[in-house]
């Protein structure tokens, strides 16, 4: 975690979208991550309550991590539903990179207005945007394709909207 206020981030080695607050060694190691080893078609399971206690209240990180999971599946509608929940609860990230699953969902669903709103949040961190654009441009030239091309086109090619 880049800071004590950040959520746990799971990296996709084909497209490293790391926080600008992340440790340099973590950023380097992230490219070796094999996100496809996460079993996305298995049901969620709860840890044993006798050992771990009650589930904590749902904060920003709960929704961010679920949105990241749904992004891996390409389930844009579920991410948008989560976004409306965090919007209603007025939850926001402390690390702007955590907007990415929500941003990706609105871009992929062609919701320009919401994508622009979140892009404005991302643009408040110019070094993050530079890093993301560099990563997406590298990745769109390789295997990952459409999502990277669309994210790059929207955030990187639209000068400051």
Protein language model regions, located:
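C-terminal luminal/periplasmic domains and tails of membrane-associated envelope-modifying transferases
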Residues: 1-161
């Amino acid at each position: 975690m880049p800071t004590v206020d950040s959520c746990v981030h799971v990296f996709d080695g084909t497209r490293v979208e790391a926080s600008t607050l992340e440790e340099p060694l973590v950023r380097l190691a992230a490219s070796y991550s094999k996100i496809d080893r996460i079993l996305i078609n298995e049901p969620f399971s709860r840890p044993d309550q006798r050992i771990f206690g009650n589930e904590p209240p749902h904060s920003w990180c709960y929704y961010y991590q679920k949105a990241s999971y749904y992004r891996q599946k390409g389930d844009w509608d579920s991410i948008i539903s989560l976004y409306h929940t965090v919007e209603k609860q007025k939850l926001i990230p402390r690390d702007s990179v955590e907007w990415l699953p929500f941003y990706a969902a609105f871009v992929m669903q062609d919701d320009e207005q919401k994508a622009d709103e979140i892009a404005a949040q991302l643009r408040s961190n110019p070094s993050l945007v530079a890093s993301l654009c560099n990563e997406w441009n590298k990745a769109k030239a390789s295997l990952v394709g459409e999502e990277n091309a669309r994210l790059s086109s929207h955030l990187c090619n639209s000068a400051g909207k």
